[in-house]
Amino acid sequence: MKALASLMIIAGISIACTSTGTERKGSVPVGVSDTIAAKAPADKGKQAPAASMISDRRAKGGTLNLAFVGDIMPGTTFPDSRLPEKDGATLFKDVDSILTAADVAAGNMEGALADEGETTKKGGKFSYSFRVPTRYGKLIADAGFDFMSMANNHAFDFGLDGVKSTEATLHSNGIAYSGIGGRKESAIVERNGIRYGFCAFGHNSYTLKHADQENVKRIIGNLREKADIVIVSFHGGAEGTAHKHLPQGKEMFLGENRGDLRNFAHFCIDNGADVVYGHGPHVVRAVELYKNHFIAYSLGNFCTPYGVNISGISGYAPVLQLTVNAADGTFVGGKINSFIQQRGKGPRRDPLNLVAKEIRSLTNADFSNPKLTIANDGTISKR
């Protein structure tokens, strides 16, 4: 997945905190690092990274190819074993060619990567608690993922020990991560001379909260000073098929404030983010072009073969491909690749492109003047 440490040394790459693993996505060595805290810009202004950090590729222009998915929970051993066929060996067989072809690919780790421990949730074994075997970290890496959000309502299913196990597993497989309050607030992934800055926000007490605008602005500002492209992930919104439409204002669910997601996404872009992608409702939602930057409000359930409802539209599992300008992160084009989950098997091709058509329908319904056109095959273009 990532270049071996020796190759990184030969290439002369010096990164603060490096993850290594098998190499992929071309022959260029890559690095994953913590983001060092820095002063946030006073306001948006799309502040450029420091001159010493601007890559030649960005300075020369060109485009970048990004891939995004929703929730990933490949299988659980709690309270009993519910694991996919062939121990997950074929989970990503229909999607890995898209993910590995992207410059970077990102998703949401919906659960703890851990081999032991008891849930800390009320209800014990009767709660929705997901304990994914740590060996599945390699499957996720081999599928092509570079970053995982941990800012969700299942990251703490097995307490701090589960969080630490998840972080260690992702790190050992060369996958960057962020999203838990008081721990790693952002990450930088370098690919082919481009620095991608990632951060993740949620609504739970232990996450970096999307309701804390001052902190959101600070974190994005820090990344803006160090990265060529800034990508924000969020977990939020009410859950279930009754909540597939994107409302105005705050969303309340199970007594929790799940966020004012339109306002949050716009705030992120206003303060320097290039792309914003979401997950949490367990269904897909609309997409938006805001100030020429792309927002996906929910990419639904991507790989949740057990433990999560995947019937009907709950099983819609898009892989969103975006092409953005390297110079400023603005939208060039994209595609919604349609997949539908199969119980115990993972995402499989949707020959009717029902997923793309659903996102198109939601986009046209939830925005009075959408600035995007989505074709039957999922191709996304500006109006």
Describe the residue ranges of each PLM region.
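Acidic, metal/ion-coordinating pockets
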Residues: 18-383
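Bacterial N-terminal signal peptides that target proteins for export
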Residues: 1-5
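Bacterial N-terminal signal peptides
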Residues: 6-14
